[in-house]
Amino acid sequence: MNTEKRAVVLACVTLQFDCDRIIKIAKQIADDTDCDLRVLSVLEPTHDYTEAAWQIEYLNMVSKQFGADMTVLFDKNADRAAAEFAKKNNVVRIVTGLHDGGEESFLVGFNILLPEMPLTMVAKDNMVYSMDAVSYTHLRAHETDSYL
């Protein structure tokens, strides 16, 4: 019996209805790479989630339509929570919205915690940008080879 976990593409979404575009692209990537799809949203702890209920339900419904489970975590540090989730769930790529440019953004923090994790960003106009991790050792080897 094979007990090895399948590789996972992780769609990281916020509570916005238009995050369905992220789930859709993540599903395409998962299918193209023979991976499972998971969806994650990390919410800051609060006492009232009334405003978020519709968005959570909608994104969960979209996740189910694409054959994915959606996990909602409650943590003040979304980047740390997502990185820990990625490590525990055999995630091989994350798919998010575009980086907002701030040094304190989710993507900057996540990249510090898991710099080797390939990343795909989906803009609101559905343009897709991907970055694959390249190790420093690999870069140095190419640099050395090019000067021989």
Per-region residue spans from a language model:
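Structural beta-alpha unit
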Residues: 66-94, 100-102, 109, 116, ...
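Short, aromatic/basic amphipathic alpha-helical patches
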Residues: 53-62, 105-113
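Conserved small/polar residues in nucleotide/adenosyl-binding loops
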Residues: 137-144
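Small/aliphatic-rich secondary-structure junction motif
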Residues: 2-53, 63-64, 89
